[in-house]
Amino acid sequence: MEWLLEDLLGAKGDMGLLWGQLTHALACRHCGSSCFQSPGNLVTLFLFVVWQIQRWWQLGRLRQLHPWCSGNMVQGKELPLLHRVAFLDHLCKQKSEVEEEGEEEEEGEDEASLDPLKPCSPTKEAPTGEQATPAPPQPSCGSEGLLKAIGIPEQTVMQPVSPSRSFPIFQILTSFPVRHKIASGNRQQQRKSQLFWGLPSLHSESLEAIFLSSGGPSPLKWSVCSSVFFNKLAFLPRSNLLLPQYHSSAQFSTHGAHTMEDLEGMAPDPQLLPPPSSPSVSSLLLHLRPFPVDHKGVLSGAEAPTQSPGTSPLEVLPGYETHLETTGHKKMPQAFEPPMPPPCQSPASLSEPRKVSPEGGLAISKDFWGTVGYREKPQASESSMPVPCPPLDSLPELQRESSLEDPSRYKPQWECRENSGNLWAFESPVLDLNPELSGTSPECVPPASETPWKGMQSRENIWVPADPVSPPSLPSVPLLESLVMGPQGVLSESKALWETMGQKENLWASDSPDPVHSTPPTTLMEPHRINPGECLATSEATWKDTEHSRNSSASRSPSLALSPPPALAPELLRVRSMGVLSDSEARCGDIQKTKNSWASKHPACNLPQDLHGASPLGVLSDSQSIVGEMEQKENCVPVFPGRGSSPSSNSVSKSHVSEPIADQSNYKPDGEAVEQRKNHWATELPAPSSLSTPLPEPHIDLELVWRNVQQREVPQGPSPLAVDPLHPVPQPPTLAEAVKIERTHPGLPKGVTCPGVKAEAPLSQRWTVPELLTHPGIHAWQWSRELKLRLKKLRQSPASRAPGPSQSFCSSPILSSTIPDFWGLPSCPPQQIYPPNPCPHSSSCHPQEVQRTVPQPVQSSHCHHFQSSSQLQPQESGRAEQGSQRGEKMKGKMVSQVPSQGPCVHMEAGVDYLSPGPGEPSNSKVLVSGKRKDKASASSSAKKREHPRKPKAGDHRRGTARLGLSTVTGKNHPAQARSLVEAPVSTFPQRSQHRGQSSQHTALPQLLLPKASGPQDQPEAGRRASDILTPRHCKHCPWAHMEKYLSFPTLKASLTRGLQKVLAKCLDNHRPLPTKSSQ
């Protein structure tokens, strides 16, 4: 402690006396040394802390470690020794035993004291080493025992000074380095042990980093090439070592070799890898990177042997590496943000190894994956960064070897990694991820030859998934892995078929960048059809996987390639939903939904039909499970950090809606759902971020909900894919129909209302809509009742009735209270389920969105609608009576209008632009209610006119999206306008709608019409909503929905005629603002 006392007290005199006294005072009465249990432990720690703080303060100003380091002090000059202090000389004079004990003791003390001092920097660490050294004079049983337990009692805890290492690591320099130097000054290779504190504190319990370095190499090289092992885990697999590694180069080298020689050999490679700009971040990122690499290496079992043939840990890693894979994936998301670009590039290199990897397995698969996968990967690599490439390349080689050794053994792990990688890769590199996904999906199917490639791909994905967005989906990785493991055996025979299809698919995927997608879907469909003929179960599953991957690749370029892939995706989705939606659907429901959302992005109603026809619904049980897994992977992959999630949520909910339709009747809903997904995808693109937030919960609940919906929907698949004529616009209705089917399982008018609500729900909420419809509907209904009461009061209150912003604001509070429900969709689903509720709910969801997207008057209408809807749900008849305020006719009209105005505007704004496409008639029905509301809320002219259509499918979503997607509504206008035209639902004055709604059928068409008339009548709708407050609307809405549901077949004709009439009226009343007339 001389140095400590000197620094603290500034005493320059003889410290021997004081030092001896301290030694005795601090000595442990049991061991005679200063241990943690010694009476002077606290004093020592305190003094040391004070000294350390002072030292840090000084170092902070000096900032130069060189003055503190003396390479001559240590045998390994590469390891800078801390500033030489008198105490070191004193220690050198003492016995080696005492010195070691004292050093260890001091190290233990330093560890204890440094633990809170984790924030100190390497410079600080150096002083720590010094500090630790003085204590050595006093033997420390505690620290010695600790070091012995660590297994490096004699090793010097020294940290090479590296500016890149910003994380606080406390170097505890014992006298052993000096003594070691004295004992073996010429020793070429010397072990340096270092106790890490701070970031390494995760392992700071007793973790000691052992640096294997040759005495000759320069400190820089040592730091670069040193392999760090905690808890004497140097012998453990690299994956374990990866955690300790903090130098990008050293980190990688650690993976490569466990010995200094290996490290030296690996040093160049790590050096090649540019460490992140931030030392601490870089260490973490590098740590994570090596981990994936190590995973790959461990998984393959070749990497470790290749780099370090003597390392046996790789053999131990099978189970351990699986764990590490999970951990690594979890960690990687966090640390991969910087590495993300490099992972992108790595896919290309991985694709190359992929080719090689199958070599061990199947030549065909190698050619297929090598050719197709490689081409596919290059796309990913285009956006990928080059940094991870070298490691990835080496990893693929190792993987190849491991695959050759036992590809099936690692396949599940590879798949798991692949899944996680895909998730990550998908999020970060859209283009790169999709091709990988395409390759990945197939990989899941083929167990043998694909396994090596999968492993490589997994590694690639692991590298590619640098984006931290995927961590949420990481949980699915184990599920996907387990799923893949099961199906792999099943898909063995379908492997060839899948490879054939996969080749086409991959080729398409490789070609798929943007425009190519349109052509590949047809090709893929053909293989799919062929495969069902050959082996529907496996080939179809395989084709689904390929198609899904294709879809994911299509999702990459959502703008250009979205249309064609969706058709294939819907088919696959239908097949999956038909075949095995229960288990894999539950697991990959979210992912699959995401994937479906991507697929739904593209209008493809006919293709799904063909697929349905081609492949038996029940054939794909096993292969579907595998495909489901693949789809899950792909679905996870398609999820973009921002919009990807949103589309996924919308698509997911839709896929759930459509997938549950396992019957032939369900095929149509599937097609519609697919189209709707398409539309949703389109919608999602404009405003995915806000939607992406809610997605996670919907994904979770949606699975259960979707199952329930499927149960409901199976008997109810009325919505026909025949809606193709309405294909562009009907898609939102189709989705709404699917939801409606789910909701109207009992055959309630909510079929109509539900579609409106469905469209009304925000993108993310759509996910929840099906869930809530099926599972959360009960509590949601309770919420709806509460909201209804509130809305009733608000409606009754003059403010709520007052048209214009005041009413909209009144509605807003309700919406605000209801918004949480919308996000959770507790209240919305109940409303959706309940015929009156859906309409009210749509309006309730709608008001917020309207507030954002529609002028205040329109908002007022929406608010009124929402209030009336919420209120009417519990009191449909009561509200109908209140509706008498405006008159029964006005009520009927407004009821139709309110659903369309409130929900439709939002639906149209949030959903229609998302889900234009086949199924328009069904959706038109939904739009009828939604558009009425939309009408009321669509005070914003043509723009909102377009919106009314979209809100139908996503009104809830819009309710939520209003918060952040008010502009999305504007974006949706074009799609909405198209939807309005296609769905024979032109913007009609609310007045006209109300008039047309005198009859329920007429009201239904008008419900659809409000969407078209929404923009024109939005101001008017606002006034009407304020006047009517939707009590009558609610009453009529349920009835209108009932009529829609009951006369859904006739609804189209009624809607057509009504739309024509209303269209004429709308054209007449559009300029007069029917709101006034309706009022």
From Swiss-Prot:
- Biased-composition ranges, Basic and acidic residues, are 398-412, 669-678
UniProt biased composition (Low complexity): 551-562, 645-655
Question: What are the Acidic residues biased-composition ranges?
Answer: 98-113
Region Disordered, annotated ranges: 97-145, 261-281, 297-317, 331-362, 376-412, 506-566, 637-678, 840-975
* Residue ranges with Pro residues bias: 336-345
Instruction: Output compositional bias ranges, type Basic residues.
Output: 942-951
**Entries under InterPro entries matching the protein:** Spata31g1-like
What role does this protein play? Dispensable for normal development and fertility.
By what name is this protein known? Answer: Spermatogenesis-associated protein 31G1
Provide the species name. Homo sapiens (Human)
